From Swiss-Prot:
Residues 730-768 form a coiled coil. Citrullinated by PADI4. S-adenosyl-L-methionine binds at G56, W58, D76, D92, D117. Residues 336-348, 457-474 have a biased composition (Acidic residues). It comes from Mus musculus (Mouse). Its EC number is 2.1.1.-. This is pre-rRNA 2'-O-ribose RNA methyltransferase FTSJ3. The gene is Ftsj3. Keywords: Citrullination, Coiled coil, Isopeptide bond, Methyltransferase, Nucleus, Phosphoprotein, Ribosome biogenesis, rRNA processing, S-adenosyl-L-methionine, Transferase, Ubl conjugation. The active site is at K157. Interacts with NIP7. Residues 802-812 have a biased composition (Basic residues).
Amino acid sequence: MGKKGKVGKSRRDKFYHLAKETGYRSRSAFKLIQLNRRFQFLQKARALLDLCAAPGGWLQVAAKFMPVSSLIVGVDLVPIKPLPNVVTLQEDITTERCRQALRKELKTWKVDVVLNDGAPNVGASWVHDAYSQAHLTLMALRLACDFLARGGCFITKVFRSRDYQPLLWIFQQLFHRVQATKPQASRHESAEIFVVCQGFLAPDKVDAKFFDPKFAFKEVEVQAKTVTELVTKKKPKAEGYAEGDLTLYHRTSVTDFLRAANPVDFLSKASEISIDDEELAQHPATTEDIRVCCQDIKVLGRKELRSLLNWRTKLRRYVAKKLKEQAKALDISLSSEEEEEGDEEEAVAETKQAPEEEEEREEEQLNRTLAEMKAQEVAELKRKKKKLLREQRKQRERVELKMDLPGVSIADEGETGMFSLRTIRGQQLLEEVTQGDMNAADTFLSDLPRDDIYVSDAEDDDDTSLESDLDPEELAGVRTHSDLKEQKYLRFTQVDDNKEEEGENPLLVPLEEKAVLQEEQASLWFSKDGFSGIEDDADEALEISQAQLLYKSRQKEQQPTDPPPPPTNLKTEKKSPQGQNEVPKETEAILGTEAVTDPGGEERGNSSDSDSSSSEDEDSWKVSRGVKRGRGSKADEDGFEVVPIQDPVKYRILDPEGLALGAVIASSKKAKRDLIDNSFNRYAFNEEEGELPEWFAQEEKQHRIRQLPVDKKEVEHYRKRWREINARPIKKVAEAKARKKRRVLKKLEQTKKKAEAVVNTVDISEREKVAQLRSLYKKAGLGKEKRQVTYVVAKKGVGRKVRRPAGVKGHFKVVDSRMKKDQRAQQRKEQKKKHKRK
């Protein structure tokens, strides 16, 4: 009994599988792709109407190849699944209701392309099916004439039948160019062909008979021709021999054969070639075979005739070479007088042509140089354009991968970046930054007299108020102290700039000074139990060292110095930092009174034995230390006032309960007051951290805690938000996944191109194509996914055959601990072998 084959298996060809892979809804999508590849009508279209569009394969192709903002409308009897940027209608194209729906959707628009891939329900009889298809095409043409713009395209499917020629004639009346084609995706056994009508004429009025199937497909009776009509009345002219040619045998010479313009025609008419020239007869190319062939040409075959043509070519070369040698000999035999006359004429001509040739040569050289420069400029422009396009492509890829925001690039750093303190290295760069653009100020000051020193009104008021408040002695002390400061600054500014060492950045202040860090480390070290006995001795040594430092600093302050004259250089004033000139008035007064001596010559600092003087000294030392600490050690070196760094605010990361409590506090003032009132309870203690044992504090925190008045739903909401935040991948992981996805997509596109090339190849069989496609997808890693294997640990005492455990689906593998140990041992052996080879 014969085996029955599958009915629809032969229909699953390469385009069926390609449609499955590329995501098209039907294999007919490739028909439209191939038609568009040939006629290029989708790229220029702004509006498209697809009749009989289900299931939507042609709509997918149109949405892919047309501009993004195009209008695409699809109509069919059956519903079409929605597509992005596509409008679908469920109507019958043969009814007036469909025309009204299209007018409502298109409004005043005219479409550029009308597609029709419709076919009736076939199966009754071939004649009936062909007529139904032609009638459907005529109705589609009627809709196309209503909505198609001038110069538009109409692509329709037609069956090859007796109604095909009338349809073609109607198309030719309405369109400028009509072409019938059958794309490669259309099956060979199918009777369908596609007619592409381009250049719609858009007549003002179309005869309704064109769209009437009774008139369009009416059979025209052809009158039969009689026998007398078939017989031609004029007798044709008799063709005989050439005039004067009475014989069939023609003998020609080899010279005529060499001079013939068409040697093939000459051989077809000649019967014999006689070699009458002795020199040509003795030529090495004239062999015995050639002589025999020349005796009877009519009996020669293709090979012998080709040898005669080659023989003719060799003889012609020989004769041409001989004629050149004879002409050369004739030129040499000219008389000497003629040669001399010729030389004189040539010399005169050369003298005339020399400047002209030189000018032409220079002009040619100049043109060549200009052309080279222009080519270099064009190449440079191309290189810059390519670089710009490459950067734009990279930026676009980064934006698509969400590595950058649109318009903001983290990777691209221009020449002018943001200001950074880390770029300032050394005092010179710092002065350039602080000075800024002072050209306008220098110009203004240069126009004024040199002797004037300008002080603002506010400074004048401060000075007058200070002079009125202080006694003469205190005022003298303040002036002496300010003179000392100015003299110290002048000595510092006179240091050579070349001796500056580029140290650390003066604007970057560390969180803690080195001395403070060293002191903290030392205190941690000496807080150990081994140093507990020598604590008193260390305190005494520290007090002695502090007293010595205090005494030395007071002696330096009490030394009288002659005040130098105040500086009048405007440039120095401009460079002087604000932190040194502006010292608090109270501090200057205190320091000044400490440094001034009595009129009798006795210093105030000598009475150190009394308690009052010692206390005053300590207070003044504290004030001076406070001033120095406020100005910092860098104030004298760099000319900037260093402000003490405040501790940054420590942000706490709140748990869900804390967030819910914060929401309650932020939403209601009354709830906030209630929370503050409830915080004073019996569970609240005022112990500082570290007073109680750690185990006791943890136990109290666990068991003696008051429940917060927050909603469970609110806490669960914030807990869910935390889970979502924690579930997000970090930026590097997201970028890596995006890069991996981009590589896979790129590899997939390359594989698709190769697969299309393999599919379009005609020389190989279908089996070889399938094998090549399978190997391509396997190399690209796009084959079948590895099936999931469930590992089941075997128990002792179970045989080789193990039943499927409960709850395990799919493929499973039985493993045991012995197998795992064996595999590890095998891996260790392989590792040892590798080390030995190295």
